[in-house]
Amino acid sequence: MTRQHLWVLLVVAGSLVAGAADGHPLQGFLYGTVETLSKQEYTGVIRWGKEESFWDDHFNSVKENLPYQKYLPEGQRGRRRKLIEIFGKDVDVAWEGDYAARQFVARFGDIVSIEPAGKERADVHLKGGSVERVNGGSNDIGNEITIYDESLGEMKVPWERIDKVTFRSTPSNVDVTARRLSGDVTTVAGEFSGFIQWDSDECLSTDKLDGESEDGKMSIPFGKIRSIAREGAHSRVKLADGRDLTLFGSNDVDESIRGILVEDPRYGRVKIGWKAFEQVTFRESRDTGRAYEDYPAPHEIRGTVRDTDGHVHTGRIAIDLDEAYTWEFLNGSRADIDYLIPLESVRSIEPQRRGSLVVLRGGAQLDLREGKDVSDESDGALIWTRETMKTYLAWDHVQRIDLD
């Protein structure tokens, strides 16, 4: 797919300094220092691989350490291997021994640093002090990263040359001419608004929509597009100059699209499939999202679990014998729309006959039908009622989970 590179559009005004003024328009861009094995340091705006550019973008891999899986009854264990897609990325999820490997997903804003520990491994240091060893699973591991250093300009650093990447607040004097895509997406399930990644990839006004018209192939910068609507197996594209086009022949404009990602503040990140998609209307904005310092240090999940026998268990919780911190996510789907919800935003989870009713702290309610965290595929809940006492509940014994 054709992509005009972001970094040729970066202009650095003056000296780059650590720290950022509160609320400046460029605060959402990834920024930090790359230390290499040759003891050199490069500081500037970062693009991870060819996709992630903002603090609310996700670093994906697979967890190597599974401290809670030993509480799963032996009869519920098994050896399997599966390739799943998580918001546009293929993640290889394997079962090691008797335990299911688990996906690692964290926003870059929740990460202090990433240290490669081999070709397919890394240590991810999170705000709050915890460290997760991750192992392969997506192209976020083992891929090169691009940094725009103030003295050198654009530099691509191969994974095998990286010693450590340390993140820090984005300075206000970094000038990026490209805008972050944002707008409103209408679907069969209603409207979603926020920052947009088209085809789980294009996120900037300089990125291009590829397709064919009756007159030939086209590659249109998103900054020139007003709206895109699904029209059967094709797309109706309306340009800012008023022209209408019907495009086909690429995964940007037909049913082979890898999904439309929307960072909707009500839910977190949603992925909209072609069948659910109706139309997107873009809006011009210089906003790039939350600043690095706007992501607080995470903490353990605590709350109350009521079981189907009426007993109440209060304490620290590991949902699905996996998610135990506020930086982690609850995932579920319905009507060709996937939701990846930060657990810090979840108020309660109530298992239903099919899926779960999830209530968010902002008041929104979601009836999610698919996804390991919300269905009968869940490995249940582990509750530390005291530091020395743990209670395990299978998912079909959980009536409701309320988070503090």
PLM regions and their residue ranges:
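Positively charged n-region of N-terminal signal peptides that target proteins for export
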Residues: 1-5
